[in-house]
Curated annotation (Swiss-Prot):
PROSITE patterns: RUVC
Chief location bin: cytoplasm
Signal peptide: none
Organism from which the protein derives: Helicobacter pylori (strain Shi470)
EC number: 3.1.21.10
Subunit structure: Homodimer which binds Holliday junction (HJ) DNA. The HJ becomes 2-fold symmetrical on binding to RuvC with unstacked arms; it has a different conformation from HJ DNA in complex with RuvA. In the full resolvosome a probable DNA-RuvA(4)-RuvB(12)-RuvC(2) complex forms which resolves the HJ.
Record protein name field: Crossover junction endodeoxyribonuclease RuvC
Amino acid sequence: MRILGIDPGSRKCGYAIVSHTSNKLSLITAGFINITTTRLQEQILDLIEALDCLLDRYEVHEVAIEDIFFGYNPKSVIKLAQFRGALSLKILERIGNFSEYTPLQVKKALTGNGKAAKEQVAFMVKRLLNITSEIKPLDISDAIAVAITHAQRLKPH
């Protein structure tokens, strides 16, 4: 099963596709969608086109999105909500459903501590997937962490 993890952002949207088979996780690809245009409508279209390409290329079965963190200023929260709404609609059209995880849930799933620093999450991502190289920017490791969190929820108890 292929899981797409998404860490939405107003400038960079982190993504990761993780394979989950027989209780084994492996990273297929990860990166970020760089949002460079200035008009909101163009930004949303660029984001959706990039998502479409990922869904086409990697035959994703499940999608998990990190919830918006509300510590930002109100303008940023509104913009992120618009991006997230557009992403959600496209995912519903293409996949049919998606799961959402708060930053606290993701941090707790990977480190055991809901207040862990991003660097601790990145360390655990590398450890769980046997990645030796650095994962930069942290938007990418966050997206991988979202996909891993979802995979852990899919495991039989």
